[in-house]
Amino acid sequence: MAALASSLIRQKREVREPGGSRPVSAQRRVCPRGTKSLCQKQLLILLSKVRLCGGRPARPDRGPEPQLKGIVTKLFCRQGFYLQANPDGSIQGTPEDTSSFTHFNLIPVGLRVVTIQSAKLGHYMAMNAEGLLYSSPHFTAECRFKECVFENYYVLYASALYRQRRSGRAWYLGLDKEGQVMKGNRVKKTKAAAHFLPKLLEVAMYQEPSLHSVPEASPSSPPAP
């Protein structure tokens, strides 16, 4: 009872004198605006490292990254002409090297296999089952050419799809003495018509072209004007 009475008396004194018997706590410091306390900084660092369970960091919506290393080049034929792809779809040789229609992308699409794309038009060079060269808006199996370095350091481009049935001789890309494209089955690898010298303009990265089906009737290259 005495202890209870003394406790009641002590409580009454605390009510009458609130600051009398309580220890004075240190006054809380208020951080000025624009600054963060050490605890706040640590909390922000901790939250920045927290990953939600089952979640992944957001990635920007990007297209597929280029993975193929090729070159932008001019193809100079030993006959004295630069290979040129014209806007009307025709392919021919020209003695002038200033035209942007002589710029081609050489994109690797297999082991020693490339596709030859017009850097200006975006069309692919193709050879059909008759050995005729034409320009295709889509990448097909007829747009694949085997690349081979000849003994004189010129490069040969042979159709990766077609060749002579009996002898197995390759069909080559070639220009005649007038700069006109030749049928692949009439071009011999030992002749100047098939010898091309790539003149590097720049190295570039490319996306792998999407393969389309070969059309039932592959168009041939229209005659050059």
Swiss-Prot record:
<dbReference type="InterPro" id="IPR008996">
    <property type="entry name" value="IL1/FGF"/>
</dbReference>
<dbReference type="GO" id="GO:0007267">
    <property type="term" value="P:cell-cell signaling"/>
</dbReference>
<comment type="similarity">
    <text>Belongs to the heparin-binding growth factors family.</text>
</comment>
<dbReference type="GO" id="GO:0008083">
    <property type="term" value="F:growth factor activity"/>
</dbReference>
<dbReference type="Pfam" id="PF00167">
    <property type="entry name" value="FGF"/>
</dbReference>
<comment type="function">
    <text>Probably involved in nervous system development and function.</text>
</comment>
<dbReference type="GO" id="GO:0017080">
    <property type="term" value="F:sodium channel regulator activity"/>
</dbReference>
<feature type="region of interest" description="Disordered">
    <location>
        <begin position="1"/>
        <end position="28"/>
    </location>
</feature>
<dbReference type="GO" id="GO:0022008">
    <property type="term" value="P:neurogenesis"/>
</dbReference>
<dbReference type="GO" id="GO:0007165">
    <property type="term" value="P:signal transduction"/>
</dbReference>
<dbReference type="InterPro" id="IPR002209">
    <property type="entry name" value="Fibroblast_GF_fam"/>
</dbReference>
<protein>
    <recommendedName>
        <fullName>Fibroblast growth factor 11</fullName>
    </recommendedName>
</protein>
<dbReference type="GO" id="GO:0005634">
    <property type="term" value="C:nucleus"/>
</dbReference>
<dbReference type="GO" id="GO:0005737">
    <property type="term" value="C:cytoplasm"/>
</dbReference>
<dbReference type="GO" id="GO:0007399">
    <property type="term" value="P:nervous system development"/>
</dbReference>
<keyword id="KW-0339">Growth factor</keyword>
